Amino acid sequence: MVTRLTLRIGVVVAGLAVVGTTAQAQRRVRGGRAVLVDRPGVGPRVGYDFNFDHAFVGGQLNLPVGRRWTLVPSAEFYPGATGSPFRLNADLKFHPPTVYGFFYVGGGFAYLHQSGASDAGANLFAGWEGRRARPFKPFIEGKFVFADNTSFNVEAGLNFPL
């Protein structure tokens, strides 16, 4: 059963995806100076779900929609767990204006599925993303998933520019 909140979150995420498809990952001019916008990226992730008490693997796609904003759709699978559980996420990540831009916060929509049952909810997360000068960017984050059961996850992974 889809609640009104879930439907609203889905509409917002779909709208952001439409806006994000026209964004170009290149230098933009702001006030007479060039501003670097990250390129889209893709990468693997691993983590641990403390509520489910199980490790998971997955991947994500990073789609910059602005100088500090990134749309991050991702999928996480729980190998070896009963019922073949998985989670699909559509998150929006924000890098606040800090000295090096390592820290980020965000939130979004979560769809959870296990043994024929599904649930929709929301994510809130904060994390650290490595230096942008390398050919890849490592990250680590803590994520709260608010659905039928609230869970806390610790995740880590790499992002490779496309």
Q: What are the language-model segments listed below?
A:
Residues 10, 15, 20, 106, ...:
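Small side chains
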Residues 41, 45, 104-106, 125, ...:
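Short glycine/serine/threonine-biased micro-segments
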Residues 24-67, 71, 77, 94, ...:
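Short glycine/proline- and aromatic-enriched beta-strand/turn motifs that initiate or cap beta-hairpins
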Residues 141-145:
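C-terminal binding/interaction regions
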Residues 35-39, 50-54, 81-87, 115-121, ...:
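Transmembrane beta-barrel outer-membrane domains
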Residues 58-138:
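Gram-negative (and chloroplast) outer-membrane scaffold detector with strong preference
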Residues 1-35:
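Cleavable N-terminal export/targeting peptides
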Residues 150-162:
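Outer-membrane beta-barrel "beta-signal"
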